[in-house]
């Protein structure tokens, strides 16, 4: 049964975190989680994931306090799993299964019974929970214990997330913390997650850029420039509140600028009057007869009066300027990018990519999707694949399919990964030489700056040209010298894309594997704008429907699930 809004289940007061080098992550954050589902949003690098780690207890704050309601379950972005981690490890039943195996082999020691306790059907219960979550291997498995022995390395990214999340929920936590839980999930898995969030008996705090998920939350916490703010309602309600604020802020800024201009005019007018009065006074004194003392006193009095007038006008102008600057800080920066990439242009008839998609007659090579299995991303079931796929000119193709259908494997095979090519169900017959590829897991030198990386990718550009291009991608001033290792996940993605787009020779085919994973809403908008400037062919794997809807796709290819 869904929970209702109540007293805070998780709260924190005056929370601060200072990194070892003295850099503050944030200071004096105070807030609470009491709604059924609360979203934590903010720009990349604002500290969202760090705040979750503090609340989960995996990171200690520099100062401040956290009140936790018993057990806090935490699902990090990268899951923190090794390829050898088993499903049994996720459910913490490995020891129980080992004891059951030993017992069945003829070892009847008392210690084994103690290890098993009341958990004789632990594997079956875990399988049932996974099946209820739409975990495909659980639906197909006939041996629960064999399923539990499967390693994470044999699962797709979405299957691993589903298994880890299901295991967390099975612990019945007091609060559930999720960091980008829908990354790598196909449409069916996302729908299952949404249903799960609607029925959880504990409050959830989730970091996500998934627009569909954000529309289902009950409260939004925004972490921006070290300040945490709360908004009642879903993401649309939050955006409406922010838009109203920005309209008011723009109006207040116009008014402040008008007042500042008026104060400047009045200051100039006052100075003009004072100058005229001073000249008139000097002329009068030159024509007046009297003691030097009396004339000096009169001049001194006039100077004091002028100084007082100047001080009054300057004070009013300073106050108006301070107000104008404060109003400017209330305006959120325009994050529009301006990029010209003529080198990526591809002639309409030029062959860019060629794939063989239908091979043999076995079940694994069937060109049709299963009748009972709806394809990922809303594609119709049983859609036939063409025998060959040829991408020509600046076409934009989305590669869709359920988790485990081999999308990422196909991309790696296209890029020449021999191991992926051996396991892929499809063959890459041709790929244009100038191809840029961004995999799900980026590998960038942590000690190099974005300026160094882009200059290495394009030695024909001067440092100033690179800085100009990076500025158009919103990397400005001294930020271009920061080492990649200190950047957020979203910023690292932007650096990786910059090195690809600005490379020499320019890419005529751009391949992106789940590019919006780990990106905040502003960075997703940034990516959409960057791709609008790109004039080559595009091949993208993404479960982000809102993102794909804005790419100007020319076709969608849905891969069947291979069992």
Give residue spans per PLM region.
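Coupling and communication elements adjacent to P-loop NTPase active sites across diverse families
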Residues: 2-15, 96-151, 157, 244-360, ...
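Flexible loop/N-cap segments at domain edges
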Residues: 322-368, 373-442, 458-460
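ABC-family P-loop ATPase nucleotide-binding domains
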Residues: 81-154, 439-499, 503-508, 514, ...
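Hydrophobic anchor residue at the start of the ABC signature
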Residues: 165, 193, 497-499, 516, ...
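Conserved A-loop
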Residues: 16-17, 23-33, 66, 386-392, ...
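GG-anchored amphipathic helix commonly corresponding to the ABC/SMC/Rad50 NBD signature/C-loop
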Residues: 157-177, 415-416, 491-511
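ABC ATPase nucleotide-binding domain signature region
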Residues: 37-38, 50-113, 393-465, 543, ...
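Catalytic Walker B motif of ABC-type/P-loop ATPase nucleotide-binding domains
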Residues: 176-180, 185, 509-514, 519-520
